[in-house]
Amino acid sequence: MGLLEKRRAGKLMLKILGAVMVIAAAALAGWIRSREYARRPNQIRRTILALRRLETEIMYGFTPLPDALLRIGEQSGEPIQFILSEAAKWMNSPHHRTAQESLQKAVQSGWKYTAMKNAEKDVLHQLSFTLGTSDRKDQLGHIATAVRQLESEEEIAREEQNRYEKMYKSLGVLCGAFIVILFY
Amino acid sequence: MSPSWLTVFPDNIRSLLSALPPSVFGGLEEIRIREGRPLEINAGGRFCYLTSEGGMTLDAAKAFMPSKQECNRLLDLITNHSLYTMEEELRKGFITIEGGHRIGLAGRTVLGGGKVEHLRDISGYNVRLAREIKGLANTLLPQILDFKHKSVLHTLILSPPQQGKTTLIRDLARQISSGTWRHPEARWPGMKVGIIDERSEIAGSKRGVPSFDVGPRTDVMDGCPKAEGMMMMIRSMSPDVLIVDEIGRSEDVDALAEALHAGVRVIATAHGSNVDDLSSRPAMSRLLECSFFQMYAVLKRTDQGMAFRLWDDKRRRVQLPDGPAREAKGREVNA
C-alpha cells in the first residue's frame, strides 16, 4: 500500500514539474516577443537622438563625418553604436569607402542586432545617399527628413507596443496553460 | 610605399596611376580629371592621356574617361566624406589635402549677393602634386645675404607660372629659419620667418599645421589675404623676414611699404619673365620706382633643374661668381 501511494505521488510530481516547465517556456517565449515590442520604439528614439546630435556636429562643429559618427556612437549605446562605428571604420583608412557605401555596409551588418524593422532601415538607407555630399543647409534638410520619418515610425511602434506588449506576455502564459490542459 | 595622395583616387584610377612607369610617376605634377572626358596627366612639363589599359596616349579618343560615379567618389574621398566642412574651400575653388597637395575644382557656382557662395556640380578636378625639394635654394640664398645687417636682402623672385617659385621660397623659408646660410662668412643664427600663405601652397597647412618642413622658427598665416596677413604678422608675430607668394595688387604694395618701415625683410614672388615686365604693371611699377627690392631673381626651369639670373636695385645685372646662370639642384623629398 505504502509503495503504491508513493508511486502515485511520484507520477503526480513529474506531471506537475512537466506542466510548470511547459508554462514557463511558453511564458518566456511570450515575454521575449513582447520585449521586442518594447525595444523597437526605444531604439528608434535613440536613433533620432543620434541624428539630432549629428545635426549639431555638422551645423556648429564642422566635424568630419567619420569623427562625428564615432563620437555620437559612443554616446548612443548599443546597438546604434555598432552601426555608427562600423560606418566610420569603412570610411577611414585603410578602407577609404565612400560615405554611402560605408553606411549601407554598416546597416547591413549591424541590423540583426537591433529590434528595428525594415521601415527604419529604409530611412537610413535613403539618408546614406546624401550624407556628407552637400553643404550644411542641405545636410540639415536631409537629416530633418530622416528624423521626421523615424518619428512617425516611432509613433506606430509605440502604438504596437501598447497593443501587443501585454498581450504577448499573457498570451504566452495562456498558451502554456492550454497545452498543459490538452495533455491532461 | 605608395605616396599618400594616391589614396584619394577611386580604385581604378589609382591602379592606372600606380601602373605608370616609375620615371613618369616620379615626375607627376598634375592629374586632371574631368567627368566624361579623358584622364590627363602632366609630368615633367609634358602632358598625355591615360588609356584604360594603363598606357599613355595623345589620342583623346582612346583615353580612359572617368564617369560621374568615379568623380563623386573622388569628391567624397578628398573631402573626408564631409563636403559640409569645406564650404570655405569650395568658395575659393580648391581643397588642400594631406601632404600639401592641392586639388583645384571646377563646377557650377552658386551666387549670393554677387559673390560666389558655393560650388556645386563639381565636374573638373586638378590634383596638383606639391613637391618638397630641400636644398633648392642652396645657390640663391648666398646671393641675397645682407652681411651688414646680418640678415637677408629684400628680394623679389620673378618667373612665369609652374617654374618652381613656390618650391623655392619654401626652401628659402626653411633655410633662413634654421640659419643654414650656405656661405662661409655668414655666421649668424636662424631668423624668425613669417609666411603669408594665402592659397595654402607654401606650407601646405592642414588644420593650421604646415605639412612641409618650413623651418623651426617659422610662423604660417594660412589662407590669409596677403596685404592683411602681412600687417597681422608684423603686429602680432614680430617676424624678421616675411615671405609672400604672388604679389601684384596695389594693396599688396602698400603692405610691403609698411613692412619696409617696420624693419622687416621681405622675400616675395611675382609672375613675370623679366624685371622690365614689372614696369608695365601699374602696382608693380610703383615698387620699381621706390626701389623697394634690393635684389631681383628671375627663375627659369631647365632640364637639369632650376636656373636664375639676378638684378640689383638699380636694375643692373649681377654677375654670379661662376657664370651667368647657375643650376640649382636639390634633393627631392617624397611627401
Residue ranges and their predicted role:
Chain A
Residues G2-G10, T130-V173:
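Membrane-interface, cytosolic juxtamembrane amphipathic helix immediately N-terminal to a transmembrane helix
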Residues L12-V20, W111, K117:
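Acidic, low-complexity proline/glycine-rich segments
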Residues A19-A29, A157-Y184:
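Bilayer-spanning, highly hydrophobic alpha-helical transmembrane segments
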Residues E36, Q75, F82-E86, R97, ...:
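Short alpha-helix boundary/capping motifs
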Residues N42, R46, A115-A119, H142:
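A generic short alpha-helical patch detector that favors 3-5-residue windows
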Residues I44-T47, L84, L124, R136, ...:
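Hydrophobic packing residues in well-ordered alpha-helices of helical domains and bundles
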